[in-house]
């Protein structure tokens, strides 16, 4: 062994009596794989069963956004890790979702999500529609003002060329 390396190792180890520090051991951090195994074991105890043919899962948040889990389309099905899995245990009222969720606004999902909306979400959808209509009115009002500025007003008895100059 290298003498310098041996000297460093001896410096960190103290052989002695009471009150001397022991050899320093590097801590090994747990990986998420161990947590996943514990979670799987707990879900197995709860008798969680897989639910087939789930196309999408939407979780509505209080701020109006939606956490959207979508089943892979046929062209994306070969990609590893983009699949959504749903497991449920009805007696224990437990549902487990596996997959990558995307946070989206309600407007991005509007056509296909209308049948999933509850009373709270319908109220937020109404507010969203009202704000969209107000934005459209404001934009139409601005366009109307722009159009009026481009076209000069003609007064009876005047010629168009005179009003342009």
Curated annotation (Swiss-Prot):
It is found in: Cytoplasm; Nucleus. It comes from the Eukaryota. GO terms for cellular component: cytosol; nascent polypeptide-associated complex; nucleus. CDD domains: NAC_BTF3. Residues 145-158 have a biased composition (Acidic residues). Residues 20-30 have a biased composition (Basic residues). One of its GO terms (biological process) is protein transport. Disulfide bonds: none annotated. Its main location: cytoplasm. Residues 1-34, 133-165 are annotated as: Disordered. Keywords: Cytoplasm, Nucleus, Protein transport, Repressor, Transcription, Transcription regulation, Transport. Residues 33-110 form the NAC-A/B domain. It holds the Pfam family NAC. InterPro entries: BTF3, NAC_A/B_dom_sf, Nas_poly-pep-assoc_cplx_dom. Belongs to the NAC-beta family. Component of the nascent polypeptide-associated complex (NAC), a dynamic component of the ribosomal exit tunnel, protecting the emerging polypeptides from interaction with other cytoplasmic proteins to ensure appropriate nascent protein targeting. The NAC complex also promotes mitochondrial protein import by enhancing productive ribosome interactions with the outer mitochondrial membrane and blocks the inappropriate interaction of ribosomes translating non-secretory nascent polypeptides with translocation sites in the membrane of the endoplasmic reticulum. Part of the nascent polypeptide-associated complex (NAC), consisting of egd2 and egd1. NAC associates with ribosomes via egd1. This is Nascent polypeptide-associated complex subunit beta. It comes from Emericella nidulans (strain FGSC A4 / ATCC 38163 / CBS 112.46 / NRRL 194 / M139) (Aspergillus nidulans). The gene is egd1.
């Amino acid at each position: 062994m290298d003498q310098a390396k041996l000297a460093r190792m001896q410096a960190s180890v103290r052989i002695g009596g009471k009150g001397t520090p022991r050899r320093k051991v590097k801590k090994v951090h747990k990986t998420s794989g161990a947590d996943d195994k514990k979670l799987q074991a707990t879900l197995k105890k709860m008798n969680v069963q897989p639910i087939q043919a789930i196309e999408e899962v939407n979780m509505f948040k209080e701020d109006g956004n939606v956490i959207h889990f979508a089943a892979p389309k046929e062209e994306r099905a070969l990609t590893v890790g983009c699949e959504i899995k749903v497991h449920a245990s009805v007696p224990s009222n437990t549902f487990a979702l596996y997959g990558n969720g995307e946070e989206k606004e309600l407007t991005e999902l509007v056509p296909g999500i209308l049948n999933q909306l509850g009373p709270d979400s319908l109220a937020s959808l109404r507010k969203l529609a009202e704000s969209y209509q107000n934005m459209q009115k404001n934009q139409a009002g601005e366009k109307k003002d722009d159009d009026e500025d481009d076209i000069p007003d003609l007064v009876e008895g005047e010629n168009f060329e005179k009003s342009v100059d």
